[in-house]
């Protein structure tokens, strides 16, 4: 493998992508800047987009794929395919899709169950090989958490209800750091402060409408022009130093 291949990750803290609500109304599309940058990183005008919605239950993965297909195919002219979780044990099928893809995108959902499934099937190793080969690895929420050493996750809330706590968990470890998506949501910043007391990682927290782009050893933020929820999008770096908790905005 060439030493000149760049490794690329775009980790989106959250944001709406134009999906339909249960009442038939459509949410806005907030992530244009992030999606355009993901495409730009491939170096191709019409790259191949592979959606892996494994943080969702199998029965929800097709609907999520159609939302992302409307963005990447209809808006931007990408060729779009998906890899559903019930196909992960089909080694040749998985290899064919991964080899085809320029972009590999994971959506939002249950990070804990997703990482467990990837490790049980060996798909975690497949994803690492894809990243090392220069494919753009990206996603939102759970699909952002997964690339880092650790994350703060609401997986128990998703599975069992809002009375469950936020948890810290190990992820794929492509990038050092404890990643926090939706850090503008109640309790998130307090949770990462506590998690970092017993972790040797640095906290990397992204609000909705903010993405952290990592190309090799270079980091930068991608921030949406406007937020549907009316928040000021931002990213934070946080850590403990000699008993003092430090939290700084990432510029």
Annotate each PLM feature.
Residues 2-45, 52, 56, 62, ...:
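C-terminal and late-domain segments of enzyme folds
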Residues 15-17, 109-111, 143:
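Short glycine-rich anion-binding loops that position phosphate/pyrophosphate groups of nucleotides
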């Amino acid at each position: 493998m060439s030493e000149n291949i760049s490794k690329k990750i775009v980790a989106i803290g959250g944001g709406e992508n134009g999906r339909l609500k249960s009442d038939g109304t459509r949410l806005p599309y907030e992530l244009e800047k992030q999606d355009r940058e993901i495409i730009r990183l491939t170096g191709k005008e019409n790259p191949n987009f592979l959606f892996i919605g494994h943080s969702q239950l199998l029965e929800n993965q097709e609907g999520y794929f159609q939302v992302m297909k409307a963005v990447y195919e209809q808006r931007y002219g990408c060729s779009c395919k998906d890899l559903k979780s019930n196909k992960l044990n089909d080694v040749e099928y998985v290899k064919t899709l991964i080899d085809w893809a320029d972009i590999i995108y994971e959506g939002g959902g249950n990070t804990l169950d997703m990482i467990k499934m990837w490790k049980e099937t060996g798909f975690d190793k497949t994803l690492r090989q894809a990243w090392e080969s220069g494919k753009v690895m990206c996603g939102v929420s759970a699909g952002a958490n997964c690339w880092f050493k650790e994350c703060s996750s609401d997986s128990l809330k998703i599975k069992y209800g809002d009375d469950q706590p936020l948890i810290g968990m190990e992820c794929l470890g492509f990038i050092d750091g404890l990643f926090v998506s939706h850090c503008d949501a109640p309790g998130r910043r307090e949770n990462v402060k506590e998690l970092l007391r017993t972790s040797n990682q640095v906290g990397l927290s992204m609000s909705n409408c903010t993405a952290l782009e990592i190309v090799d050893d270079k980091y930068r933020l991608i921030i949406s022009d406007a937020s549907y929820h009316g928040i000021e999008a931002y990213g934070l770096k946080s850590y403990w130093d000699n008993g003092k908790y430090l939290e700084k905005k990432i510029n």
